[in-house]
């Protein structure tokens, strides 16, 4: 089954302990925007406490500028370390990271560096995300995403054994510009998210 690998990765966790979902937004895609908002609501529905990370002021116009992107990552990661420094990860029976864009890099790097065993939802990941991606992740990508080339994302996801859901003609927000199509996309995406979160 699609989610078996994620379930196997977290099978030995204490299901009776509290559950925590951490939201890692993008630079311009905040936690109150559709993908993160509805994913958070689903997580709350399944009993997760919700914590949203905030990065503060980051460099603008980073697209296509490797130096600025690196600076943005380092600043955002530093803010993330500070925001999460008091969390006792071992006190939670289930941990879920929900991330978007540069947030997928930050979430994956944080989980890797702190050896956090949990599930991860990657909305519109960047190629750098897969440098850190761990078992128990799923990813969503639009084929018209100007921030990440589809063939590269597909190849990296296959190499890391990360289930990847492709949305034709969708941009970096998983939107097409057509309202009815976008409503259908968010519904289909959240159905996948719901099944992923609900799988023990």
PLM region spans:
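Conserved alpha/beta-hydrolase fold motif
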Residues: 92-97, 120
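A conserved short beta-strand
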Residues: 115-126, 135-136
